[in-house]
Amino acid sequence: MKLNYFQGALYPWRFCVIVGLLLAMVGAIVWRIVDLHVIDHDFLKGQGDARSVRHIAIPAHRGLITDRNGEPLAVSTPVTTLWANPKELMTAKERWPQLAAALGQDTKLFADRIEQNAEREFIYLVRGLTPEQGEGVIALKVPGVYSIEEFRRFYPAGEVVAHAVGFTDVDDRGREGIELAFDEWLAGVPGKRQVLKDRRGRVIKDVQVTKNAKPGKTLALSIDLRLQYLAHRELRNALLENGAKAGSLVIMDVKTGEILAMTNQPTYNPNNRRNLQPAAMRNRAMIDVFEPGSTVKPFSMSAALASGRWKPSDIVDVYPGTLQIGRYTIRDVSRNSRQLDLTGILIKSSNVGISKIAFDIGAESIYSVMQQVGLGQDTGLGFPGERVGNLPNHRKWPKAETATLAYGYGLSVTAIQLAHAYAALANDGKSVPLSMTRVDRVPDGVQVISPEVASTVQGMLQQVVEAQGGVFRAQVPGYHAAGKSGTARKVSVGTKGYRENAYRSLFAGFAPATDPRIAMVVVIDEPSKAGYFGGLVSAPVFSKVMAGALRLMNVPPDNLPTATEQQQVNAAPAKGGRG
């Protein structure tokens, strides 16, 4: 009987414990459900989203680069970049041949690359595809292959304006030319968008744009694409005709300081830089320095006139065409002259005559004029790789160095500097800052040569081109032109002295001479066919480009020849054009 009593009392107790435990467990589960779905809902949702919500950059295109008239020189086009997660791609090896073929890649090289990066989660497959090409690859639905939208630079004018505009790298950053110099201005600011991604990294939902992309700013250059094409064509033809190694041509607006054209040969296509040679990338107009030779004689003459000791009608005895200075002999190319006035010294390009004037006025005054017009000085353009050159300044000037300075040896300049100096002379002695961007208001200039002296030298240089025995090949049909040729021996690299039979042929001038609008410098490096004098090689290029440029700019002719005069010009014997 006792056993039955205890058994009857024990079973209800056990039942209550079990039921209580079950109720507690159910209560705990219900509480947890309430906790997850009500109390901690926002926190847990945020934690879940944090594991699937990502911020993706919205690419911003670079600013448009145009010429002065709005013609596009550099534009950004949308492209597709394909990337892969090698860890995922390793699970689909059977698809690799198909993917490699779609990418235009060798299957074995593709497989080797994926296997070498098997532990990584990101590698580029190919960049810069057209959107259509990218969509075609993505449509294959190969696991681990994804796309990114980017922008790539395209240069409509190609090689014609390559050295001025430059180019960007694969990440759309400026690397040469204007693209580098104005990179901060042109570069856009990427935006951000919030997206949901699945476990494979694929975007399954766009949530919101958190930051709008800000495109780069438009930049209008001073370049006139019409003049640039003209200069490019004629310079290229000149190199072919003369068997030359390289060349440069610069056109400047004398009033505003704008560089209207700047071209070099050889050049390159910025849209296709495969197998690009370093020599083709040289912006020679700004990087190559050279002795300017006789092209600086007008500035030596300016110093003489400014000194008050000389006037245009003064006579200098240049016979017999040589002048001995110690062990150094100064020689004229033409030695059939006896006495020359100052204009005659420029027409005949007499080294003896300009040296005698330099001895009288002193090298310091010549140095001062050359410095003020910008020879061997920083141009202020801030162009990548631009060189300054050298204008020596001796504490005491020996006679030989005084003479060589006067006729353009012993100093080094760039084509841009020489064009700037001639622009100042053409602008009545007023130098205005150089600009590679369009100038909408004529800047203030600095009077570096008096207007009276500048006007006199302008007239002399007009005679250099138009007088009998002058550089007739520089004459511009329909316009009065002014300028000076030069022929400079090339310095030997690594040894003292000059190279044998290696010259730079130069011509610098401006037009119309009666009211100058543009200045131009032509440099032909190492011509090897018909000759090497600047008046023979570079002057014809000046004539053709200047004539075309003035007409394109709608500058009215100021020297239309009569029919008889035109026949005389065509029948003129091939002489003159000394450097």
UniProtKB/Swiss-Prot annotation:
Any one of the GO CC terms: plasma membrane
Name of this chain's protein: Peptidoglycan D,D-transpeptidase FtsI
Pathway in which this enzyme or protein is active: Cell wall biogenesis; peptidoglycan biosynthesis
Induction comment from the UniProt entry of this chain: Mainly produced during exponential phase of growth.
Entry-linked Gene3D superfamilies: 3.30.450.330, DD-peptidase/beta-lactamase superfamily (3.40.710.10), Penicillin-binding protein 2a (Domain 2) (3.90.1310.10)
Topology relative to the membrane: Single-pass membrane protein
GO MF annotation, one: penicillin binding
One of the Pfam families matching this protein, by short name: PBP_dimer
Composition bias, Polar residues: 561-570
InterPro entries xref list: Bact_Transpept/Beta-Lactamase, Beta-lactam/transpept-like, FtsI_transpept, PBP_dimer, PBP_dimer_sf, PCN-bd_Tpept
Main location (coarse class): membrane
Annotated region (Disordered), positions in chain: 558-579
Biological process per Gene Ontology, one example term: regulation of cell shape
Transmembrane portions of the chain: 15-35
Active site (record annotation): S294
Organism: Pseudomonas aeruginosa (strain ATCC 15692 / DSM 22644 / CIP 104116 / JCM 14847 / LMG 12228 / 1C / PRS 101 / PAO1)
Function description: Catalyzes cross-linking of the peptidoglycan cell wall at the division septum. Binds penicillin.
